[in-house]
Amino acid sequence: MFQEENVDKRVESILSIWKEQVGVELRNTISYLSRHLEEVELMNTNGRYSILYTIKTDNGEILYYEGGNPKDEFNNEELEKSWDKIPSTIRNFYRTVHNGFYFYASQSMGLVPLENVTFFDDDEWGIIEELEEPLQIDLQTTFGFFKSGMGGYVAVDYKNSNNDNATLWWTNKEPRYNMNFWDIVDEWIVIGFEV
């Protein structure tokens, strides 16, 4: 793909991977990228390859997103133990599209690399003591795959993840349970493009 000198062909090539692998799950993201993706470039950072996406917004601002290499070594011990229990659509994204896709400057507003997926049982969540309703996830089986950069996570409790069920988790307000993982992720990525 990166031996291709024509930028439009490189862009179309990467978008074809997205369409083939997550065309339903991330349809709004793909639609936005189809209209706004200006360039894709191969990056090598300390021997790790990734793709830098150059996105031009409606107001002319240039944003950079990074898509990690799906062939990267798995570097998250807790997640690796439970990987086969994570919904197949999520595993498919990480295996075939990218090991994370996020706003380059903040490394947020997107799906984080596997090494940065949050294992909820490792963190202190002060919000738990303040919840009005009983906690509906098990911290020992919950992982945050998407970080908003402002205290928001899209998290999956693999004990309750049928049909890509997820929790919209906040560090400072009530969580929202039984949400569709891909609906939230797709919407939040596009919001990140437009902010």
Model-derived segments and spans:
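A recognition module on extended beta-rich or small alphabeta surfaces enriched in W/G with H and D/E
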Residues: L135-L139, F143-V195
